[in-house]
Design a protein with these regions (language model features):
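Non-catalytic, usually N-terminal nucleic-acid engagement modules in DNA/RNA processing proteins
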Residues: 1-140, 268, 296-304
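Glycine-enriched alpha-helix->loop->beta-strand junction motifs that scaffold or abut catalytic
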Residues: 33-38, 69-70, 141-144, 163-170, ...
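Active-site-adjacent beta->alpha loops and helix N-cap segments on the catalytic face
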Residues: 49-63, 123-138, 155-157, 176-194, ...
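Catalytic cores of alpha/beta
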Residues: 89-96, 154-164, 209-223, 269, ...
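Glycine-rich adenosine-cofactor-binding loop
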Residues: 148-150, 172, 185-191, 195-216, ...
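Glycine-rich phosphate-binding active-site loops on the catalytic face of alpha/beta enzymes
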Residues: 173-175, 210-249, 283, 291, ...
Length: 304
């Protein structure tokens, strides 16, 4: 049987807001926007640690608080950043990634996190066999729900094995976009239907899916994640689905209302003193998150 996550989420896909990774202003922005689904990376929390270190965060740390105030939180393994981002160029081995997995497990267990955890999908750097080693090992050592990630290296036979093994499976949308740039939407739709037809109770996650059209086409999936809500404060421009506008053009009354809400959270609930510039950044990001939530609701149903 699956995790029953779709029952928890009602009957349609829920988009998890990614990219905050424990930052106070991002936490306040998303809370003020009344979003209820998050995805964060454990990368910075385990990078410089050893497996036997103390991974405990303060009880009021954002990572621990968001684990309880949201309907669902997904923890990414940070493996992509380790392999292709900040850690690019470092030689990874079975031993080094075993240590990474040990640290990930210790971090989750010591902080009593209830989040769903993404596996160490190392197919591209170590191979499919090694990915299965980590997949089976993590299922044995960690009680949390887990997401297993399909990559092209697995092949369709490997996908069948993953479906049989998994309760919750993810498709990497950025990978599909790169490998099949002209047909990735159709390929995603084919794969999601294939997975559901083979195992109707399985949960499906669309990893890194920023495409609202794809979210609508695959609304029967369980979850997706996106950093689109941060594009406005990162690039200055934001698309609400009808028109593209600069964040400086947001209505002043809406900015003031959201600024007040963000300040109440940061100064009142969190006990922080942030600069006016940071608070304005948070208010704008929060409004972008609200717009995204509205877009997802129109495309795929309630995001409550």
């Amino acid at each position: 049987m699956g995790l029953g996550v779709r029952e928890l989420f009602d009957n349609n896909i829920k988009v998890h807001f990614a990219g905050s990774d424990g930052g106070e202003i991002f936490y306040a922005a998303l809370l003020a926007a009344q979003t209820k689904y998050r995805l964060f990376s454990c990368y910075k929390y385990i990078l410089k640690c050893r497996p036997d270190d103390d991974f405990r965060l303060p009880a009021d740390h954002v990572i621990r608080v968001q684990d309880t105030v949201n309907r669902h939180v997904i923890q990414d393994s940070g493996l992509f950043t380790l392999m292709f981002g900040a850690g690019k160029g470092q030689m990874q081995t079975l031993e080094s990634l075993t240590e990474w997995q040990d640290k990930l497990i210790a971090f989750v267990q010591q902080n009593n996190l209830r989040c769903t955890c993404v596996e160490l999908d190392c197919q591209k750097v170590l191979g499919v066999r090694e990915a299965w080693y980590f997949r089976e090992r993590m299922k044995k050592l960690l009680d949390n729900p887990q997401i297993n990630v399909f990559h092209f290296e697995d092949g369709m036979r490997g996908l069948d094995s993953m479906i049989d093994f998994s309760d919750y499976i993810a498709l990497s949308i950025p990978e599909l976009r790169i490998i099949k740039p002209k047909t990735f939407r159709e390929d995603t739709r084919y794969l999601t239907h294939y997975i559901k037809n083979r195992k109707p109770e399985i949960d499906i996650h669309l990893l890194g899916c920023t495409d609202v059209k794809m979210i609508a086409q695959n609304s029967f999936c369980t979850s997706a994640d996106s950093t689109s809500w941060l594009s406005g404060v990162k690039y200055g421009w934001f698309d609400d689905g009808n028109q593209k506008a600069h964040i400086n053009q947001f209505r002043k009354d809406l900015i003031e209302q959201r600024l007040s809400a963000v300040r109440t959270i940061t100064e009142g609930s969190r006990g922080l003193e942030l600069t006016d510039k940071t608070l304005l950044y948070g208010a704008r990001a929060s409004l972008c998150a609200t717009i995204c939530k509205q877009k997802y609701t129109r495309a795929a149903g309630s995001q409550e």
